Amino acid sequence: MRFNGFHAATLGILAAFVAVPAAAKTISVSATTPDANEKLQEALILAEPGDIVQLGAGVWKLVDGLSLDVPNVTVRGAGAGEGGSVLDFTGQQGAGEGLLVTSDDVYLTNFAVLNTKGDGIKSKGADRIVYHQLRVEWTAGPKETNGAYGIYPVESTDVLIDSVYVRGASDAGIYVGQSKNIIVRESIATENVAGIEIENSYNADVHDNIATKNTGGILVFDLPSLPMQGGQNVRVFGNEINDNSTPNFAPKGNIVASVPTGTGVLVMANRHVEIFDNVFEDNGTANVMIVGYRYEHKDPKYQPLPKDIVVRDNQHGKAGYAPKFAGGDMIAAAMGGSIPPVLWDGSGDAIVLDKVGVLSLNLPDVKTPQSEAKPSPADLSKGTPPAALPAIKLPDAMEAKVR
């Protein structure tokens, strides 16, 4: 009996020992070794949950994209500036992403991604992902051949994008699609077609960012024929949205190719969007545009109208002096040289409490061609705004990573 008891106890101890995961480790990767590129991808493959892949200072000249499919991994560089950790894809042979993440609880911080043929950093189906202090840039400036998206999480729950810089994306610098529970904050988007875009997503706070010198500063879209529809509950607040004057360089056929140069915030077919406490300045078409989806589609479930849009407590500087939509120049001339800061196509509903003018195109039916517009001033200050949206709260563990 004593033997059996001892044996059972020993087995219990061994079982407990086996159940304890290996201690998290730091995998350091240098940019200066002859096999630096291979070692970097190897580190991402061999990492285990809890590990840190530490990138040294230097430049990796990469010809292939990188991938990470291990959960709960941190990829940390030595900084996102020129003297930090730089992943340079100028010589990339394929057309894919620079870095693709497909696992949960990943933390990306303090490195740069340059000149990818495709998207800069993409995550797909990666819940609780954190993008922090990153730089994604196409260094030759705006070009149609640049990658589409800089920072690109899609199909995710709980997304935090904090203190990133994106320049030169031919679609959107910072894009979050088909996701829910999102915060985009304290970031800079410049010289992209769309600076920041929230598309077909639920529950997003976009705040304290700078969107400047894009074609359009911040876009909130809902599009047809996607698995997740009914985009709603988005707050755009506390942002500086100025001088979005870059000519549209999106490839033809992209939905953002229709964004007029000089757009501050553009809401298309979304529901319950609050735009408040922003500073607008020098957006040649409009500071705020609210429109329906006016393109052909074959999705019977799609709802193309903007609803419950609220615009309040914003500061409006110069706007509407160079409207880049069909007939905009003639409308501006007829109105003394510029159109009001807020432009509404007349579809859906919105409340504008800012003490500025609103121009309606009086096109309530999205099937009516824009050529039939009958522009006139509109008063959208009446009515009762919907209940204010709550702040987005992400898991404490995500916030702790960036503190």
Predicted regions and their residues:
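Bacterial N-terminal signal peptides that target proteins for export
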Residues: 1-10
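N-terminal signal peptide c-region/cleavage motif recognized by signal peptidases
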Residues: 19-21
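Right-handed parallel beta-helix
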Residues: 50, 78, 104-115, 127-140, ...
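Extracellular beta-strand/beta-solenoid scaffold signature
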Residues: 37-41, 63, 89-99, 115-122, ...
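Right-handed parallel beta-helix/beta-spiral solenoid domain characteristic of secreted/periplasmic
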Residues: 28-38, 52-54, 72-117, 140
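Acidic, glycine- and Ser/Thr-rich low-complexity intrinsically disordered tracts
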Residues: 296, 301-403
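Short, T/G/N/S-enriched strand-turn elements that build extracellular solenoid repeat scaffolds
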Residues: 38-46, 61-70, 75, 122-125, ...
